[in-house]
Design a protein with these regions (language model features):
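Basic, polyanion-binding surface patches
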Residues: 4-173
Length: 173
């Protein structure tokens, strides 16, 4: 089969050898897929934890299910394994600093970015909020996919924060 015009082959060919593909090439290829940015929050006792996640997706409309994929080495992974609930805050275009903060990147000091909804922490001013009860967790590769049933949803009218090819972009960029 001929390669579609305009595509550059980085690896592979007739005898595809996945061992030849390195993580950087894989990440670069996936970087061509624009994603929204979320902060996944959870509570452990009186402590609130949050982690920046762009591996977020809807799974089902009936019942309403979403999934987040969390690296098993992340502190948030251990916390999610101890709880039965998580929040998803879809970040707006004005919240890049919060994405960086929860990704452990250098960011300006963040002063209490959370609001409480039904006693659960969510990022203040986000594009949308979900509160989910964990239905199932699947360990796959070096991540765990946490599937949650949506119990609360709220939406604000603003533009999303997007990530494409290793940088933040806006709609129309």
């Amino acid at each position: 089969m001929d390669k579609p015009s305009g595509l550059l082959t980085l690896w592979g060919g007739s005898g595809l050898n996945l061992d030849m593909m390195n993580q950087r090439e894989f990440r670069n290829a996936l970087g061509h897929f624009a994603t929204g940015i979320t902060v996944v929050t959870m509570r452990e006792g009186d402590t609130v934890h949050g982690i920046t996640v762009n591996a977020f997706m809807s799974v089902s409309l009936d019942p309403p299910l979403v999934a987040v994929s969390i690296d098993r080495q992340a502190t948030a992974h251990q916390t999610l394994n101890k709880t039965n609930r998580y929040g998803v805050s879809m970040l707006g275009s004005d919240q890049e600093h919060l994405s960086n903060h929860f990704a452990n990147r250098f960011a300006a000091e963040v002063v209490e970015p959370f609001i409480e909804v039904d006693g659960f922490p969510l990022v203040n001013g986000a594009l949308a909020h979900l509160i989910c009860d964990i239905e199932v967790a699947h360990e796959v590769g070096d991540h765990t996919i946490f599937i949650g049933q949506v119990k609360h949803i709220a939406v604000n009218d603003k533009k999303p924060l997007l990530y494409y090819q290793g940088k933040y972009v806006g709609l129309g960029d």
